[in-house]
Design a protein with these regions (language model features):
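Acidic, metal/ion-coordinating pockets
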Residues: 7, 15, 21-357, 434, ...
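Catalytic centers of hydrolytic enzymes
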Residues: 15, 24-84, 90, 212-230, ...
């Protein structure tokens, strides 16, 4: 019977395909009631929400080995997001569907970087995006760059809480298509009009994200003034309602941390659905601070972002939605309106629905109902890979994006698929119980070598959790080190090394791997780390770190910068690094980390990593 198990699964898969094809639908359909475009009680206005696309236009192609068979499938991609939107437009009529994005759409993916953001701009123009706000990573670019993109857009960029101090402009401070808010007029088939007011909000980068004028392109934003979120929302909402808005939505880059176990279940949600709680652990959560003080009736819904988590939740009776990063999902908020006795359309808040998270997939795993990258072991729980349909229509590459493929794909593929290096000599990349990590150590050694630094240290998050021995392409290097990060060096004393490393290891949740350092740590019962001793490897031999001696430290711009929220931006580490940055003593490369690393490993052929974790020369040593 066990031997027959794979064949039974194949037979079941064949039956599913046959039944689906007989019904005219290829694959799995949803097991919930969808919103009827011709509902007799309400006029529904669908609002599509995406956020944190981070420049990922093309899908990621995954390969997993199941026995002797290799499964190939795609994860994410705007070609599938476009298909959902156009199916929805067919159902409701294009005039009734609105599409908004919550920001962070340029910075990240190789396609956006390679083509200077143009591929993202072209997509939003072609698909007919109605509006966006800007996220914290839009501030990574020079202000003139963002303004040029906004001015070329066919949609509105909505940011209400800013003003340019030099020109005193509010509307238009970010370019020709920048508005503080906008009323979208939806003409119904009976010629009635429903007005949706949308207010854009972004982070106060000089407060919430601590944007200094010393790091890279962010100096070009120095003349920007940020207003209070609450005051701006209340005043603008009142203004929009006086202008006839039947509902007011906040388009933001704010998000919540919510329980993802329940949240990732695809369903049609309402305010009484069990969705999984959202947590108030993050004391810096802008959205919770806003929700705690906002008055009822100011905002009817929120499109968010930033946390890279699924959100289809109601907090303080306000529906909110955001999705995980990299164009892997989208949500749809359905706003129901009903005419009152005076003939005015009133939003029926209690009947608002959110459909999602909708997976951007042409194939999904039957049980998990998504197309995330999984291991061969996880395949048994995820279920067989089947074609996917939504509302009776197959999800596939929408033909509207074909001109963008014709324009960009060949050049992208040629660049991305360059072979750089083959890593071997290990079963897989993993962190052992000491905190040492093979891939971390490999890259940190390279960074120290490139910059001829005494040591290098970077947070764990920059490296993937797992990697099997393989040949890495140019795209692999980029994906492991995205966001245009750069290698930076700074001279520090031995005493400063102890303060910096002591801070980041004690306040951080994960280990900070390093090159040429031995960090001896104690961990208490609560998991809190304490650095007991730091020593330096010089030509393989341990040396004491001398307090008044100068050493060259290498790290990344993102990790060192106080904008990152990383542990370098805390305590004594912050005081040391921030002062050196102000004094222009932090020197950053002109090239990005992925460029420098690809150049470093190019031509090395096969690299054996078997000795990158050496028990006799530990980099992180846990004192029992």
């Amino acid at each position: 019977m066990l031997l027959l198990y794979p064949f039974i699964n194949q037979f079941k898969a064949m039956l599913v395909r046959e039944m689906s094809e007989q019904n005219g639908n290829l694959g799995l359909n949803q097991n919930y009631d969808r919103v009827n475009p011709n509902d007799k009680n309400y006029v529904y206005i669908p609002i599509v929400g995406t956020d944190d696309i981070h420049g990922n236009f093309f899908p990621k192609v995954n390969h997993i080995q199941i026995g002797e068979e290799e499964l190939t499938y795609k994860t994410g991609g705007l070609e599938f997001v476009a298909k959902y939107i156009n199916i929805l437009r067919e159902e409701f009529g294009a005039h009734r569907v609105l599409y908004f994005d919550g920001g962070d759409f340029y910075q990240g993916g190789m396609a956006s970087v390679l083509f200077d953001g143009e591929i993202m701009q072209d997509f939003f123009n072609i698909i007919g995006l109605n509006g966006s706000t800007i996220g914290n990573h839009e501030f990574d670019y020079p202000r003139s760059w963002i303004e040029s993109k906004i001015s070329r857009a066919n949609y509105k960029t909505l940011v209400h809480n800013i003003r340019d101090n030099s020109t005193l402009k509010k509307r238009g401070a970010l370019g020709r298509n920048h508005e503080r808010s906008h009323i979208y007029k939806i003409k119904l088939d009976n010629n009635d009009i429903i007005k949706i007011g949308v207010i854009g909000l972004t982070f106060n980068m000089k407060n919430d994200k601590k944007m200094p004028n010393t790091w890279g392109n962010r100096a070009t934003w120095d003349s920007l003034h940020f207003y209070s979120y609450l005051t701006e929302l209340e005043q603008e909402s009142s203004k929009l309602r006086k202008l006839g808005a039947n509902a007011v939505i906040a388009l933001t880059h704010f998000g919540l941390v919510c329980n993802q176990t329940l949240a990732m279940k695809l369903d049609m949600y309402n305010k009484s659905s069990i969705q999984g709680e959202c947590f108030r652990d993050d004391e810096d959560s802008v959205l919770y601070k806003l929700l705690d003080v906002i008055k009822p009736g100011v905002i009817d819904g929120i499109i968010g972002g930033d946390t890279h988590m699924e959100m289809h939740h109601w907090e303080n009776n306000i529906p909110m939605m955001s999705v995980p990063t990299h164009a892997r999902y989208l949500n749809i908020m359905y706003l129901p309106f009903k005419k009152n006795e005076k003939g005015k359309y009133i939003l029926v808040n209690d009947e608002i629905k959110i459909e999602g998270p909708l997976p951007a997939c042409e194939k999904i795993f039957k049980n998990s109902q998504n197309c995330e990258l999984i291991s061969s072991k996880e395949y048994l729980q995820a279920g067989e890979l089947i074609n996917y349909s939504w509302h009776g229509k197959k999800i596939e590459k929408d033909r509207i994006v074909q001109p963008l493929y014709d324009k960009y794909y060949k050049e992208y593929q040629t660049y991305a698929e360059q072979s750089i290096v083959t890593f071997e000599g290990f079963d897989k990349i993993k962190v052992d119980k000491s905190g040492d990590c093979i891939l971390c150590n490999t890259y940190l050694d390279a960074i120290a070598d490139i910059k001829k630094a005494d040591f290098a240290i970077i947070n764990r998050g920059i490296f993937p959790e797992e990697l099997v021995p393989c040949t890495l392409t140019r795209e692999d290097f980029y994906n492991q080190m995205p966001y245009l990060d750069k290698i930076c060096t700074v001279n520090v004393t031995g005493e400063e090394i102890k303060k910096i490393v002591g801070t980041v290891q004690s306040v951080g949740k994960s280990f900070y791997p390093s090159s040429n350092l031995k960090q001896s740590l104690k961990i208490n019962k609560e998991g809190k780390k304490e650095v007991v001793k730091i020593e330096l490897y010089v030509n393989g031999q341990l040396k004491e770190i001398v307090n008044d001696k100068i050493y060259k430290m290498a790290s990344s711009m993102y990790v060192l910068s106080e904008t990152s929220g990383e542990d370098f931006a805390k305590g004594e580490s912050y005081e040391i690094i921030h002062k050196k940055a102000i004094d222009k003593k932090v020197i950053c490369s002109n090239k990005t980390i992925d460029e420098e690393m690809a150049e470093y490993f190019k031509g090395k052929g096969v690299v054996d990593l078997s000795k990158k974790v050496d028990p006799k020369k530990p980099r992180i040593f846990i004192i029992e």
